[in-house]
From Swiss-Prot:
Gene name of this polypeptide: rplS
Full protein name: Large ribosomal subunit protein bL19
Protein family membership: Belongs to the bacterial ribosomal protein bL19 family.
Keywords for the protein's UniProt record, in alphabetical order: Ribonucleoprotein, Ribosomal protein
Gene Ontology annotations for the cellular component aspect, listed alphabetically: cytosolic large ribosomal subunit
Taxonomic lineage of the native organism: Bacteria, Bacillati, Actinomycetota, Actinomycetes, Mycobacteriales
Keyword Disulfide bond assigned: no
Gene3D superfamilies in the record: 2.30.30.790
GO terms, molecular function: structural constituent of ribosome
Alphabetical list of HAMAP family matching this protein: Ribosomal_bL19
Function: This protein is located at the 30S-50S ribosomal subunit interface and may play a role in the structure and function of the aminoacyl-tRNA binding site.
Annotated source species: Corynebacterium jeikeium (strain K411)
């Protein structure tokens, strides 16, 4: 095992819930403004999850005031306070880029039971 692998293993988080593309999440992100810090909640649908280990990331998409907003988070980032899984989506793809063109009811995802 290389030295870098040991450093990476020490920084992996173990409090991340199981989720995949199509799931709706609440991501509580620590935002530091000057000397104050607060939590900001970003709620949306996971459209992709890629890489593995310490470099693993996921992208969440939501529509805010009619504008599509996507944000990519590192899974093991210390800036993420917690992740809540709100619903599990039933999808047949690992990357849901087609949701970018969908509007309204066409962008809905069925819930997995």
């Amino acid at each position: 095992m290389h030295i870098l692998d040991k450093v990476d293993a020490a920084q992996l988080r173990d409090d991340i819930p199981e989720f995949r593309a199509g799931d709706t999440l609440d991501v509580h992100v620590k935002v530091i403004e000057g000397s104050k810090s607060r939590l900001q909640v970003f709620r949306g649908v996971v459209i992709r999850r890629q890489n593995s280990g310490i470099r693993e990331t996921f992208t969440i998409r939501k529509v805010s005031f009619g504008i599509g907003v996507e944000r990519t988070f590192p899974v093991h980032s210390p800036n993420i306070d917690r992740i809540d899984v709100l619903s599990r989506g039933k999808v047949r793809r690992a990357k849901l880029y087609y949701l970018r063109e969908r509007r309204g009811k066409a962008a809905r995802i069925k819930e997995r039971i």
